[in-house]
Amino acid sequence: MKILVINCGSSSLKYQVFNMENEDVLAKGAIERIGIEGSFLKHEPAGGEEVKIEKDVTDHKAAFKMVVDAITDEGHGVLKDLKEIEAVGHRVVHGGEEFSGSVIIDDDVMNALESCINLAPLHNPPNIYGIEASKANMPGVPQVGVFDTAFHQTMPKKAYLYGIPYEYYEKHSVRRYGFHGTSHKYVASRAADMLGKPLEDLKLITCHLGNGASVAAINKGESVDTSMGLTPLEGLVMGTRSGSMDPSIIKFLMDKEGLSIDEVDNILNKKSGVLGLSGLSNDFRDLEEAAAEGNERAENTLEVFYYTVSKYIGSYLAALNGADAIIFTAGLGENSPSVREAVTENLSYAGIKVDKDKNQVRGKETDISTDDASTRVLVVPTNEELMIAREAKGLLGK
């Protein structure tokens, strides 16, 4: 069984082709700068050389046609016939309260996705474009939607309600949703395998630390709390996002700086986080290098990030009444020993202790705890694309 996985952004389309008999990746690639001058495709067949094709790509429908051509090409393709694809799995950022799991996409689902656009105006439209392009290029092939928010739909009301008039939840669905759900779900499953215990018997805290970052509390395989909220802006200080802050800062900045609400929103999403704090970069490697050279703002910025992650882990230890393991994943979580060490430094009270030698690992599944740690600390590379393919396969009953 072969499944195509699609992840559409506003000007990009990333894809992978899976052979689900052994979960091997047959090919992967991306089309960048859709609708912008200088668009191109990078295609990488398994065991083959990367192919780059520069071509004007006007929209997502044209981009999807390029993907179809690439994966069926006689020279660098991996399929003899497009009919070998039995399903297309789509990453969808926001499913609102409509979706607590993955679904086969029909007209009702498409209408529901349209109704969620106001909750994710930047992310959901390109996700929808990708689905429409896939349906146009591959009519009759099942399309499966896998939602970043779905995994967190098991959160109880005490975790997702905001302390604002209840009517806004009833009228506008204003609540905490959480994101990175596919990643949190995948690494929790892998952690259970690594620990040799059923997921249903475990209490886990998963830390997805990349340019976007979130922490989740998982009890018996279900999300019970997570750091992101109505949008991905809430929670941790991130690459360019502010994370949680006093909401009155918004009006304060509007008054003091003469800014519009849209300008403040842009600042909080694209000019804040470690970029805004440091004034240097949203790349932690740059910040670590600057801090090592004595840059005080870079050093302070790193400390703010470490501190906020540690605080969320601490709060979720309380929510779960302890945890069996802390899991680090995504770009920073998988590849930065210094981040993992700094985040866990003040958590020894909870039996969380990192072995400095084991912690030097990058991008590999590893238990980095000391032998006497009562709470394990794991590094688990995420694989959201494989999780989407598995969800699609499961829905087709194969």
Curated annotation (Swiss-Prot):
One of its GO terms (cellular component) is cytoplasm. Mg(2+). Can also accept Mn(2+). GO terms for biological process: acetate metabolic process; acetyl-CoA biosynthetic process. GO terms for molecular function: acetate kinase activity; ATP binding; magnesium ion binding. The keyword Chloroplast does not apply. Keywords: ATP-binding, Cytoplasm, Kinase, Magnesium, Metal-binding, Nucleotide-binding, Transferase. The active site is at residue 148. ATP binds at residues 14, 208-212, 283-285, 331-335. Its cofactor is Mg(2+); Mn(2+). It is found in: Cytoplasm. Mg(2+) binds at residues 7, 384. Substrate binds at residue 91. InterPro entries: Ac/propionate_kinase (IPR004372), Aliphatic_acid_kin_short-chain (IPR000890), Aliphatic_acid_kinase_CS (IPR023865), ATPase_NBD (IPR043129). The record marks 180, 241 as: Transition state stabilizer. Its EC number is 2.7.2.1. Belongs to the acetokinase family. HAMAP family: Acetate_kinase. Catalyzes the formation of acetyl phosphate from acetate and ATP. Can also catalyze the reverse reaction. NCBIfam families: ackA. This is Acetate kinase. It comes from Natranaerobius thermophilus (strain ATCC BAA-1301 / DSM 18059 / JW/NM-WN-LF).
